[in-house]
C-alpha cells in the first residue's frame, strides 16, 4: 500500500512537507511541484532548437550559392585545375585582365549578397522601470488589515490570504494603486486610467531622459497590458501624451498574461528587421485597479496576495551607430504556446465566481502546467545556447532513453555554462524554488528574481526588467555576459529571451534604476 501511494503522489506531482508545532504535534502539507524539467523531453523540441540555431542564409551561402557561382566563374573565364596549380607553384604566371575583372566582380557579388541577407542586429539601448511614490507603499500587515476591514471577505478567506501572504515572499515595500487603498476602494475607469498613466509615463519619462531620445524619433511603439484595455488604447494614450509622429507603427497587446513582455520584444525584433534605421519602444505593465477581486473564491484570491503595481519601458534600435551606447544585443527569442491543450488553456482564466464577481482564477494544476511549458521551452532553447559538449552529452542520453529504451540516468545540461545571469519571472516563491532546483542554480543566480519579488511583488510582464535592473545595480554585468530572461503566463505560454552585454554596466549608471537608493540593503533573507 505504501508503494502504491508513492506512485500516485509521483504521478500527480505532489510533495509532502512536515513541520513540527511542538513536541507532541506535527503538520503535514501536500503541495504540487513542478515536473522534472529536463528528464522528460521530446525529440521534436530538440529538433526544433537545432533547426532554429542554424542560420539559413549561411547554410544557403556555403552549400549552394558559393559552389554554384564558382562553377559559373570557371565556365566564363576558362580557368582549369591546371591553371590553379600553376598559379600556386609559379607566382610569375599572370591572369589576363578579363579573368581578374571577373574574379573581382564575383567576390564583390558574393560578399554583397551575404552582407545583405545576414541577420541584422537589434540592440537594447536602455530601459527604465517605474518606481511609484512612497505613498503607494503597502506592507504585508497593512495589506492584511485592509483586507480584513474591507468587509467583503469571510473569516476563512481572510485567514487564507494571511497564510498565502506570509509565505509568498513579498516584503513590506511593494506598491498598490490609490484606487485600491482608498477607503472605500475606488475601482472605476478614472482611477484605472490614472494608474496606467502614472506607470507608463513615469517609465517613459525616465527612459527618454536617460537615453536622450526624443519621442518623435520613435518609429515603433508596442504596449502590453493583459487585463486593462480601454478605448482609445494604451498605445494611443502614449502617442497622444508625447505627441508622437503620425506614421508611427503602434501595437497594443492585451490578454496575453505575464509572458507578454517577451512577446512584445519578439514583435519589436521582427518589425525592426523590416524597418531599417528605426527606434522601437516597448512598454510592459499590468493594471491592478479594475482587477482587484472582492469575492471569496480562493483560486481568485491568490492574485490579490501577489500582484502589485509596476511597469517598464525598453528602447530597442537597429541603427549600427547605436551599438556603442547600447547595453545589450538580442541573441535569441524562443516562444512556447501550450494553448491547444484544454488544461493549459484553462489554468489561468478570467471569469465570474458563483456570485458574479469577476476575478482571475489560478488552477491547482498551474505548477505542473508551468513546468511542462518551461520544459518544452528549455529543450528548444538548449541547442541554440549550450556548449557543444553539453549538447552532445544531453542528446546521447536522450537517444539512449527515447530510442533504445535504455534505463540510464538522464543527463541534465548545465545552463550555467551558457549564461552568467538569470532573470526568471517573479511569479511566486514556490515556482522560483522549483525552477532553481530543476536547473541546479545557486542562490546567487536566483537573487535578482527573489529580491524583485520581495521588493516589488509580482509586477507581471515587467518583473523581468526589475530583475535585470537589480543585476545592473549590483555591478554584475560585464562585457560579453549572457543573460537569460524566462517568462511564463496565461495561455499557457513560456517565452525566453537571450541578451549579450555589449559593454560593462557601471553602478554609476543608476539614473532611472528602480533600485537606486535601496540596492545596498539587498539581498535580504526571504521566506523559504
From Swiss-Prot:
Reactions catalysed: a very-long-chain acyl-CoA + malonyl-CoA + H(+) = a very-long-chain 3-oxoacyl-CoA + CO2 + CoA
Protein name, per record: 3-ketoacyl-CoA synthase 1
Catalytic residues (positions): 258, 337, 421, 425, 454, 458
Residues passing through the membrane, by range: 59-79, 95-115
All copies of domain FAE, residue ranges: 114-403
Membrane topology, from the record: Multi-pass membrane protein
Organism, scientific name: Arabidopsis thaliana (Mouse-ear cress)
MF annotations from Gene Ontology: fatty acid elongase activity
